[in-house]
């Protein structure tokens, strides 16, 4: 039997009595955001809304995005990335578990010097994929062109965020490249590996 999302007490400033809120709402109030699933439009819109709201609420207090994601859709992921760059507060990114595909892209998108991986975290980068097998011939060609543009765009961001040469990033994106936390640090995707 599922227990649902745990509730925790929270006292609003100026109020005597605490109210019970789900743990995620409590953490959001502390500016702690979570991506713990595949990136899709729904989670993308939720995270974007939270980042914008929290930025408006206080534009000097940093945000923390915890990532444990197998990746997901490119466009919703890029929307999260763009929002991270747009909001005034610095966005720390923390990899716990796995940051693969779009998850690693978002991990690299944190404020430089504020990107962290837990010691046993795994990171994976690769090129964007498509559903070519579902497309008609004309659609296939248009989709291939769009996919190449997306790949170039993602590659440029990785080059900028990691400091690696274009040829290294391009070569790495040709296949699934898995990394430990320390390898991700050496690759420039994270700046720090958490220690006990």
Curated annotation (Swiss-Prot):
Belongs to the peptidase S14 family. Its EC number is 3.4.21.92. GO terms for cellular component: chloroplast stroma; endopeptidase Clp complex. Cleaves peptides in various proteins in a process that requires ATP hydrolysis. Has a chymotrypsin-like activity. Plays a major role in the degradation of misfolded proteins. InterPro entries: ClpP (IPR001907), ClpP/crotonase-like_dom_sf (IPR029045), ClpP/TepA (IPR023562), ClpP_His_AS (IPR033135), ClpP_Ser_AS (IPR018215). GO terms for biological process: protein quality control for misfolded or incompletely synthesized proteins. It catalyses: Hydrolysis of proteins to small peptides in the presence of ATP and magnesium. alpha-casein is the usual test substrate. In the absence of ATP, only oligopeptides shorter than five residues are hydrolyzed (such as succinyl-Leu-Tyr-|-NHMec, and Leu-Tyr-Leu-|-Tyr-Trp, in which cleavage of the -Tyr-|-Leu- and -Tyr-|-Trp bonds also occurs). Component of the chloroplastic Clp protease core complex. The keyword Hydrolase applies. The active site is at residues 101, 126. It is found in: Plastid, Chloroplast stroma. Keywords: Chloroplast, Hydrolase, Plastid, Protease, Serine protease. This is ATP-dependent Clp protease proteolytic subunit. The keyword 4Fe-4S does not apply. Its main location: plastid.
């Amino acid at each position: 039997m599922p227990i649902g999302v745990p509730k925790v007490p929270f006292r609003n400033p100026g109020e005597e009595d605490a109210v019970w809120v789900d743990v995620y709402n409590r953490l959001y109030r502390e500016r702690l955001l979570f991506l713990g699933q595949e990136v899709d439009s729904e989670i993308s819109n939720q995270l974007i809304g939270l980042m914008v709201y929290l930025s408006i609420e206080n534009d000097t207090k940093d945000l923390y995005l915890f990532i444990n994601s197998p990746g997901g859709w490119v466009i919703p992921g890029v929307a999260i990335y763009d929002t991270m760059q747009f909001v005034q507060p610095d966005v720390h990114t923390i990899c716990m578990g796995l940051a693969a595909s779009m998850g690693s892209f978002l991990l690299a998108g944190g404020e430089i010097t504020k990107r962290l991986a837990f010691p046993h975290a795994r990171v994976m980068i690769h090129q964007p994929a498509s559903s070519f097998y579902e497309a008609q011939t004309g659609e296939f060609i248009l989709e291939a062109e769009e996919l190449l543009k997306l790949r170039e765009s993602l590659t440029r961001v990785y080059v900028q965020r990691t400091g690696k040469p274009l040829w290294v990033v391009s070569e790495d994106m040709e296949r699934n490249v898995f990394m430990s936390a320390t390898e991700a640090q050496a690759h420039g995707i994270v700046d720090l590996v958490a220690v006990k």
